[in-house]
UniProtKB/Swiss-Prot annotation:
Family in the record: Belongs to the protease EspG/VirA family.
Protein's name according to its UniProt entry: Cysteine protease-like VirA
InterPro entries to which the protein is assigned, alphabetical: Cys_protease_VirA/EspG, Cys_protease_VirA/EspG_N
Catalytic residues as annotated in Swiss-Prot or TrEMBL: 34
GO biological process, alphabetically ordered: proteolysis
Function: Alpha-tubulin-specific protease that is required for entry into epithelial cells and for subsequent intra- and intercellular spreading. Contributes to bacterial entry into epithelial cells by inducing microtubule (MT) destabilization and the formation of membrane ruffles. The membrane ruffling evoked by VirA results from the activation of host rac1, which is associated with the destruction of MT networks. Creates a tunnel inside the host cell cytoplasm by breaking down the microtubule infrastructure.
Compartments, record wording: Secreted
Pfam families: EspG
Species whose genome carries this gene: Shigella sonnei (strain Ss046)
Length: 400
């Protein structure tokens, strides 16, 4: 088995990207497993640029990987495989992922960039891989969507938690740039939302979208904001103006909510928790959405929803954000830090309903924002390291 593509590249470059062109023109059945693994890490298994046959070959290779046992994880090993007699190990150590493989009688290794690492994780088989104490990823899992409800009810259910995927460049996910896009991400999401799209909860209390829209406007988050700007916290009078414009001043029924939001909107850690949850790099890429749609169509599912042939009814995407205050072990935990910490759970739910069936995909990211975290790219980067994320991914298609 020739592994020169990877080995030579290891000597000349820290990234595998520069060798992709040397493999993409080769007939697929002539590629070595190293070349296939290279394409997976470079593009991801769900890349729309590859054929279904290529994706099948990639999936077959990735299915060879199994979770490593705890006693095998001295160097951070979390997955291993034996392919064509060659041992491959995937390791994560101090936030850096490396691929180890046996080349003759020598062990070769290559470090992955963060993008390559994410492509690798999203391509692992439906088994649970543990990556340290705070990072667990569950790879794609297939399920069955069974219902006897009529098509209109199925569509309504999907719409209630979804909004249209935004097709143009003004709102499309930007490059993976280490939180530099977060202000634009929340602006795009809120501006494009409607009553059935983004849902935001604090301690299970839904926060009205108009209230959030007024908040980000007062914070100066707009289409022209500098991506590296640190947000300036609002004064009591500024927050009070936002609250009074959204709740009737004389109505005592909203008094509890008004006091709650007045407190939250002056807490930098809450603003950090809220804005970071919209960072699109935490969630889903357009290629993943395209893959789900292609998968549903390629499976040739029977027309269960009784739609017109070739009718594409829904291509939707919803965003659900849950922020919960962390209950301190003692009263000093709040006073010493000047605020409280927040747990953030941010889910995105793209769904596709076509004449051929229903596809639902969920990606959920959970992390902790510590008390006093400042709403800035630097503050978010320090508060939310990549290894703290927990991502779940599922595809549901109709039972054939």
């Amino acid at each position: 088995m020739q592994t020169s593509n990877i080995t030579n590249h290891e000597r000349n470059d820290s990234s595998w990207m520069s060798t992709v062109k040397s493999t993409t023109e080769v007939s697929w059945n002539k590629l070595s497993f190293c070349d296939v693994l290279l394409k997976i890490i470079t593009f991801g298994i769900y890349s729309p640029h590859e054929t279904l046959a290529e994706k099948y070959s990639e999936k077959k290779l990735m299915d060879s990987f199994s979770p490593s046992l705890s006693q095998d994880k001295m160097d951070g090993e979390f997955a291993h495989a034996n392919i064509d007699g060659i041992s491959i190990r995937l390791c994560l150590n101090k936030g850096i992922c490396s691929v180890f493989y046996l080349d003759g009688d020598k062990i070769q290794s290559t470090q992955l960039s963060s993008k390559e690492y994410n492509n690798l994780l999203s391509s692992l088989p439906p088994k649970q891989f543990n990556l340290g104490k705070v990072h667990t990823i569950t790879a794609p899992v297939s399920g069955n969507f069974k219902t006897h409800k009529p098509a209109p009810e199925v569509i309504e259910t999907a719409i209630n938690c979804c909004t249209s995927i935004i097709p143009n460049d003004d709102y499309f996910p930007v490059k993976d740039t280490d939180f530099n896009s977060v202000w634009h991400d929340i602006y795009r999401d809120i501006r494009a939302s409607n009553s059935n799209s983004t849902k935001i909860y604090f301690n299970n209390i839904e926060i009205p979208l108009k209230l959030i829209a007024d908040l980000i406007n007062e914070l100066g988050i707009n289409e022209f904001i500098d991506s590296k700007k640190e947000l300036q916290m609002l004064s009591y009078n500024q927050v009070n103006k936002i609250i009074n414009s959204n709740f009737p001043q004389q109505d005592l029924c909203f008094q509890t909510e008004k006091l709650l939001f007045t407190s939250l909107f002056q807490d930098p850690a809450f603003i950090s928790a809220l804005t970071s949850a919209f960072w699109q790099s935490l969630h889903i890429t357009s290629s993943s959405v395209e893959h789900i749609y292609a998968q549903i169509m390629s499976e040739n599912i029977e027309n269960r929803l009784n739609f017109m042939p070739e009718q594409r009814v829904i291509n939707n995407c919803g965003h659900i954000i849950k922020i919960n205050a962390v209950v301190p072990k003692n009263d000093t935990a709040i006073s010493a830090s000047g605020g409280r910490a927040y747990e953030v759970s941010s889910s995105i739910l793209p769904s596709h309903i076509t004449c051929n069936g229903v596809g639902i995909n969920k990606i959920e990211t959970s992390y902790l924002v510590h008390a006093g975290t400042l709403p800035s790219s630097e503050g978010l980067r320090n508060a939310i390291p990549p290894e703290s994320r927990q991502v779940s991914f599922a595809i549901i298609s109709p039972d054939v």
